[in-house]
Structures are given as structure tokens and as C-alpha cells.
């Protein structure tokens, strides 16, 4: 190959190489802005669990007949009131035979907090659907207003794990929260060793049946 042809070949090769580099750079330069300006929407966050539990001070009842004073006190602590169980028992008129009815817990809750509580009775042996609906609505309203609920129960209540809580002579518990739109309720039990458990609204309604609750 003569020198002129060799120089021409080198020049053409140089242009091809340069063109390839430039073309590559141009492709990268065009791709880079696309990558940097591409906005990818994050995956939607999973819905937050519909749950609300009030802050409260749990105390276990000291004997077999102080369930109402203990449950009432737990409810009072959701509103920043923390009297002793003995003081609450005196206000309730509690004796070794227990506390007469939920009317007393409603009265004392209103006396200490300034009002807002009402008594609801379920006189039947099992709660009717409309009574369960009212219980759910009352618990949601009370908890949203930062008021613990006191429930007077009798018989055996079964929590969401299937654990039975038998009180054939009657018992008092506090309801301090709800989840799943109120279909399950957080019970603070002043007698139970576990202290707290969840119970469905219909199971709690049946447990309250023949008694009542303060909300």
C-alpha cells in the first residue's frame, strides 16, 4: 500500500473510531437524562391497622370482690385520674359481696370526671345484633374521646385466642381500645393473670348480657 493510500486508510479508521466513541457518548448522554428524570412512584403503603388503645394504668384487684373498683380505676386513668382502689370502692359502696351494678360505676365515673358516661343495660341472656352494634358504637365513641369503658359481665367470655374467662358470679372489666372497626375490643381485666386480651364485639356483648356497661 502506498503512503497516500495508507494515510487515507488511517484517516478513515480514525474517523470510524472517533465516530464510534462519539456515537457511544451521544447514546449515553441521551440515556442518562432519561434515567435521572424518570420518576418511579413508590408502591402504596399497606393500610394502617385500624386500632386504637388508650393509655391507662393497670392495677390488679387485691381480692376477690374488688373487680369493680379496679376496673373503674383503670377507666379513670384513661382520663388522667388515679384514685386508689380503696377510694373508688368507698365511692361505689363495694362490700365483700361485690358491687351492686353498673349503675354505681357510671355514677362514680361521672362524679370523678365531671360527666359524659351513660349506662346501657342488656337484659337478655344473649345480646341481640342491634345491641352488639350499639356496644361497638359506644366503645368507639368512648375510646375516641379518651374514655375507658367499664363492663359488668357474667358467665364465661371467650377471647380471640379461644381462651375462656369464666366468672359465674359476675365480674367487672375495663374496655380500653378497639381494632378492626370496633369488631374486636381490648379488655383490661383486673383479675386475669394476662391482664389484657382482645375479644370480639359479639362475644363481649354476650358476656355483658343480663348486666350492662358504662360508656
Language-model regions, residue ranges each:
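Conserved active-site-adjacent core of cysteine acyl-enzyme catalytic domains
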Residues: 32, 87, 91-215
Amino acid at each position: 500500500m502506498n503512503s497516500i493510500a495508507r494515510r487515507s486508510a488511517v484517516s478513515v479508521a480514525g474517523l470510524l473510531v472517533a465516530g464510534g466513541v462519539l456515537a457511544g457518548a451521544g447514546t449515553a448522554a441521551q440515556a442518562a437524562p432519561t434515567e435521572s428524570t424518570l420518576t418511579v412512584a413508590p408502591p402504596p403503603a399497606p393500610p394502617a391497622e385500624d386500632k386504637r388503645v388508650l393509655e391507662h394504668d393497670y392495677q390488679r384487684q387485691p381480692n376477690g370482690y374488688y373487680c369493680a373498683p379496679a376496673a373503674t380505676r383503670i377507666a379513670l386513668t384513661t382520663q388522667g385520674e388515679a384514685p386508689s382502689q380503696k377510694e373508688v370502692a368507698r365511692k361505689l359502696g363495694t362490700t365483700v359481696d361485690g358491687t351492686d351494678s353498673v349503675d354505681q360505676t357510671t355514677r362514680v365515673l361521672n362524679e370523678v370526671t365531671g360527666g359524659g358516661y351513660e349506662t346501657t343495660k342488656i337484659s337478655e341472656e344473649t345480646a341481640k345484633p342491634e345491641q352488639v352494634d350499639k356496644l361497638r358504637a359506644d366503645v368507639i365513641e368512648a375510646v375516641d374521646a379518651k374514655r375507658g369503658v367499664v363492663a359488668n359481665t357474667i358467665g364465661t367470655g371467650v377471647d380471640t385466642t379461644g381462651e375462656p374467662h369464666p366468672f359465674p358470679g359476675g365480674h367487672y372489666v375495663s374496655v380500653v381500645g378497639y381494632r378492626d372497626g370496633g369488631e374486636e375490643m381490648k379488655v383490661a381485666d383486673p383479675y386475669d393473670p394476662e391482664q389484657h386480651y382482645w375479644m370480639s364485639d359479639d362475644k363481649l356483648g354476650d358476656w355483658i348480657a343480663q348486666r350492662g356497661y358504662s360508656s
